[in-house]
């Protein structure tokens, strides 16, 4: 029985569409092996074989964040398992996303990157991908805001765009409940650094709560073990500290 594989490049985006990450779906994790050797090893896993042989359509959301290396390996993996030299082994592939948004995080152990985006790969060209550009905007109705966002998306910085952004910079907000505005940072490390600094400035007594959460999971030869420090078992809090 054939089916449609619904995937995305991150856990959060996969959850929103009721799918799984493309890395989990394909069995491709973080590896320092030679690409072809690694693919050959993954292609022998029974559940991966069954998954790709019955796959009719593969959907990959947030395609801009998929590395060229992973894109090429998925392409080749499908060919090997299905014994079909057509692009992706004859599987219909639907890619969605915006290459003007977040790009891929390239593997640090690969010192030289010939390509940054998957559309630069020979496999992309060989797949003869048809581009469909959606133009209707559903999330915004403010015409000026939409025009500003579209210019920023294309890297255009003119006087109109600058004026709109500057008008919102450091704008005073009503602070009725004494809550500080949320700050966004590119890394968890930087966010933790700022959170700890604010936490230390609060003079109230600290209270620590410890939690032990047990989760049952089905593991299959993971090449990307969960980082030991991904989550802490202790939560520290003080009166007046924001959570």
Q: How would you describe each model-predicted region?
A:
Residues 1-243:
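Conserved ATP-binding/catalytic motifs of P-loop helicase motor domains
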